[in-house]
Amino acid sequence: ELKQYFDQLAIDGMWIDMNEASSFCTGSCGSGKPEDEVPVYPWLLGSAEPPHRKINTTDLFLVPPYAIHNLLPEISDKTIETTAVHSNGVIEYHVHNLYGYMESKATRDFLLQHRPDERPFLLSRSTFSGSGALVNHWTGDNAATWQDLHLSIASVFDFGIFGIPMVGADICGFNGNTTEELCARWIELGAFYPFSRGHNAIDMLPQELYRWDSVAEASRRALAVRYSLLPYFYTMYQHSVEVGWPVARPLVFEFPSISAVVDNDRQMLVGDSILISPALQKGAVSVDAFFPSGRWYDWYTYVEVAGSDANITLDAPLEHVNVHIRGGKIVPIQP
């Protein structure tokens, strides 16, 4: 099937989604209608016993002995039944998290065979240990809220630590209707995610970046910086492959001896040289940004900021994101 696609179109990359595996219904879904879900019986939930049967080890595959904090009530909801037995006798419970990984590997193997001279671009929602060697990732279905804008920074940090350096969140938010101000602030930050992409849920209000004048202007400014920094991003990706360091990283990675930055999840370093200090609150006109000791230079004006291991208040008008270059570093850029 993939070969048929690639024989007809020059596809640049692939996005493999819903590969947890995820489903719009629970159970066999035999009718093909999501509303016709298979009933969930109490004994499958561990809350009661079925008639004439006692609980046995099978129930552990439906109700694990530890909390996993899953979104849905039961671990088999909207996915492959965890008691399902594969053709080789393996129970789904034991291999569920490998589904996305194996799909990623199979897809990447095909792309390498089909175009051996090109590094494949693959985006996968489901990942596992080692996925960073195969695919890129986005943080899933977030919400169009100021809280999720803030949380996206820590999420990007997390996956960098997990070994997936090209990662990003849905810019402007996925679920729920965004606002002009939120979308402007999100693209100002999102332009510097390693993987930068806007995305929206079905039936939500349109949120293309050109919908509002202020968002369009914020986008032009932030994306112009990103495109200038593409050689630097590329260098950081290569460095990540060779050394293992994330592309987007918290300040504590570069300044581990400064206790004040241990829990700083409101700023983001791109590599070791570019500091992003976004506005993350509704109605903000300034941001308090932490500057480690040393020289830092405003990206736009080249004005020096003398870091002193303290916060400095920076102006943050709606269409502006604060970007600073670390003194003494070489940053390759393009026009």
State the predicted function of each range.
Residues E1-Q334:
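Catalytic-domain carbohydrate-binding cleft regions of carbohydrate-active enzymes
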